[in-house]
């Protein structure tokens, strides 16, 4: 009933808050890249498990735990840490332009996700072949792409000066 929906919403908010604080307190000790990698793996697992529970129509506590895993993983990685890393990786001469492009790209892709989800969710393919799980599998796939991208392409910025970052980019 409504009480269960309220409890679930409280769990979502609590996990989001707790794991945001995990990011705040570990970003300097663990580094940015390890948080990205761990968070992206958690996001992939959360979306994959959720997609599987929807596909098999076995929704219940496992679905809720998968959602909480995704929320917690995002809150400790791609949510807050990306902004720390972006502010550290660009030299002063281009930082404002680079941050503007990053923010614009984020909002563009947020709009794409928000507008594509209902289209994919309501599609005949999704409803007839995937029992409503296709969007979660698609987003899980994008988490894998993000994982490989971070692993191969994103440098660790922890403890690096702006000069070191500038030298890193000029050698690539």
Question: Residues of each region from the PLM?
Answer:
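Alpha-helical transmembrane bundle of multi-pass membrane proteins
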Residues: 1-172
